[in-house]
Amino acid sequence: EGGGLSADSGEVIIDAEGLFLLPGAIDPQVHFREPGQPEKEDIGSGSRAAAAGGVTSFLDMPNNVPAATTLKAMQSKIDSATRNAVTHHGFFIGATPNNVSDLQDAVGTPDNPSPTDGICGIKVFMGSSTGDLLVHQQKHLENIFANTGGIIATHAEDEDRLNERWPEFKHRTDIAAHAEWRDETCALMATQRASALAKDHDHRLHVLHLTSGIEADW
């Protein structure tokens, strides 16, 4: 005989005999371009596409137009998801060199972590990427790691190395140039730096899109 599962009154029963039951996947880094660029994608269309592919939860990034760096901006995204998303969802607030008080409003402090419903953590771009969010100076990173609660998720690339190597690559237009410019050493340097900050300040850390074996081995 099978297990002891039984339906409660009013619950829908799906006959799945002979089928596979698979867990929904979680995508911890999506870039639904809402607000600012809905012609590319918005929360509704992105979540429907996710669900069609078996992704039942997503965490969205803050490098929108404009960037989501305040609680007010975050609440607008959360409200849109409440109306339009068809999956579970969460949102990262973007860090800047001078918005620690906004981050605290969203996720609290080390002594009093108080994440706002719908906000899953702080996104720190240690290297420049799409959008205008960039925090790479040590004093600003220290301030964020020392004075905020919750989880910090990093785009871990070393900005100084990117700038040093840019003259070598700025005339390249081939697809390989991107990976060669943003090389393994660039990623490792930032991952090591973020890890040291997290350890020094006892802060939870998630390194997004870790891309190299040397980072994993380190």
Show the residue positions of the predicted features.
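Metal-associated gating/positioning segment near the N- to mid-region
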Residues: A16-N84
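Short beta->alpha linker loops
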Residues: T69, A95-P97, L210-I214
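Structured loop/turn residues at beta-strand edges in well-structured enzyme cores
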Residues: D8, G53, T87, D117
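Histidine/acidic residue-rich metal-binding segments in metalloenzymes
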Residues: S101-W218
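Short, surface-exposed connector motifs at secondary-structure boundaries
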Residues: V55-L59, N84-H89, L197-L205
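Histidine-rich, glycine-flanked metal-binding segment
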Residues: E1-P23
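Hydrophobic faces of well-ordered beta-strands that scaffold small-molecule active sites
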Residues: G24-V30, F58-D60, H89-I93, C120-V124, ...
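Active-site mouth loops of central-metabolism enzymes
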Residues: P28-E41, N64, T87-V100, H178-E184
